[in-house]
Curated annotation (Swiss-Prot):
RNaseP catalyzes the removal of the 5'-leader sequence from pre-tRNA to produce the mature 5'-terminus. It can also cleave other RNA substrates such as 4.5S RNA. The protein component plays an auxiliary but essential role in vivo by binding to the 5'-leader sequence and broadening the substrate specificity of the ribozyme. GO terms for molecular function: 3'-tRNA processing endoribonuclease activity; ribonuclease P activity; tRNA binding. Belongs to the RnpA family. This is Ribonuclease P protein component. Consists of a catalytic RNA component (M1 or rnpB) and a protein subunit. InterPro entries: Ribosomal_Su5_D2-typ_SF (IPR020568), Ribsml_uS5_D2-typ_fold_subgr (IPR014721), RNase_P (IPR000100). The keyword Transferase does not apply. GO terms for cellular component: ribonuclease P complex.
Amino acid sequence: MRKSYRVKSEKDFQQVFESGNSVANRAFVIYKVEKPENKHFRVGISVGKKVGHTAVARNRLKRYIRAVIDEEKLEIDPQVDFLIITRPYARNFDMVKVRKNLLHALALAHIIEEMPDEVEEN
């Protein structure tokens, strides 16, 4: 995922955090703000120390999240900035669990239309 797809500055993070709508599941909180002037979506990822006590664990989760976003970028609404805040419940997730829970949260936030069939719960 290129850097132009990331919310990076503190000002942009605060803007999305303060003026955005939020939805959550057990593993992730999503803050979303509509930006009609955007050419493509931007995402910010936050994995706190309560989630992973080592940098290795936190970076692994961020890498998994970025991989899911990269795989699903054609499905994501291009006129939105959103933040993904990871909760401690996701501490020991593997790639499959991150994908399933993140797509569920993105569908709740209406950032993607619906969960792909291969990850839906029965």
